[in-house]
A protein has these predicted regions:
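Cytosolic, long alpha-helical scaffolding segments
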Residues: 1-144
């Protein structure tokens, strides 16, 4: 019997997955920093809608990682990955709509600059969640 613990997946995959998880938290922090640095006094309704999608993405990532702990027997990994990808697509659409609205309806250049950055980083949060899901999918494929 081996006396050392051998993880069910490669170390490189664990490192890659943990880096993508860390990126999610970094991107969320980046949104908050943009709000603070831009001195945004009120939150735009479009930002609230995008934030709701980011929260849903993060919740699905949490569910995915919980299911991933026993990925060989998990029945809902594929569904969670699909849901995260769909949420990221929703985020892309909201991003485009928000940016269009910002650039066509707003006349204050400072407001445009601040909210452009915030929208970009909200969208990057959803992208980061999708990267976690893609990495989980890749690891499952390699180890099934």
């Amino acid at each position: 019997l081996a006396k050392e613990f051998i993880p069910p997946i490669e170390r490189e995959d664990i490192v890659e997955l943990s880096q993508h998880i860390d990126t999610v938290t970094d991107k969320v922090e980046d949104v908050l920093l943009r709000i603070y640095m831009g001195n945004a006094q009120e939150i735009e309704p479009d930002a609230l809608e995008m934030t709701d999608v980011v929260i849903q993405c993060c919740e699905k990532v949490r569910e995915l990682l919980t299911a991933f702990a026993d990925f060989r027997r998990s029945k809902n990994l594929k569904d969670l990955i699909i849901q995260i990808n769909a949420l990221e697509e929703t985020s892309d659409k909201l991003f485009m709509q928000s940016m269009r609205k910002l650039h066509t309806e707003c006349t204050d250049p400072l407001h445009i600059i601040v909210w452009r950055e915030i929208y970009i980083y909200l969208e990057r949060c959803a992208d980061a969640c999708e990267h976690v899901a893609d990495t989980v999918e890749s690891v499952v494929m390699k180890n099934s």
